[in-house]
Amino acid sequence: MEYTFRWFGPQDPSKLKEIRQIGINGIVTSLANVKYGQKWSSEDIKKRKSLIESYKVNKSKKLNWSVVESLPVHNDIKKRSGKYKYFIDQYKDSLVNLAKNKITNICYNFMPLIDWVRTDLNFELPNGSQALKYNHLHVCAFENFILKSKNAKLR
């Protein structure tokens, strides 16, 4: 088992310098700066990987980019409409570029409409720590009152 930690990239208030102190070896991250549907270039991947690897966990071991979270799936692919074939090719090229950089553990999020939904980004647990939380009732309210969806239901 490898201990990893989610890092939201260079703009994350949690810095790699601090994260490396919590007993992890791997970083779970993405290239959130790349537009959905656009290819992740080998150069961009290499640059992010080098940034992560520039931090040592100890004298002989560096942090590593262990997991991609997430390589976004464009909505045209999800709906099989529009330029979905183009976006599939871009996605495949991104996978190849990740593999060329020896990053092979790739998560994706196939949520329709909104790619990444959490209803509370600072939910306090009983021990005082914070976690991300999903509340389906809040999502239904969002669908009904913000998106004005006719299909929102409590499942």
Which residues fall in each region the model found?
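Active-site acidic/histidine proton-transfer and metal-coordination neighborhood
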Residues: 77-155
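Short, acidic/polar
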Residues: 9-21, 48, 86-97
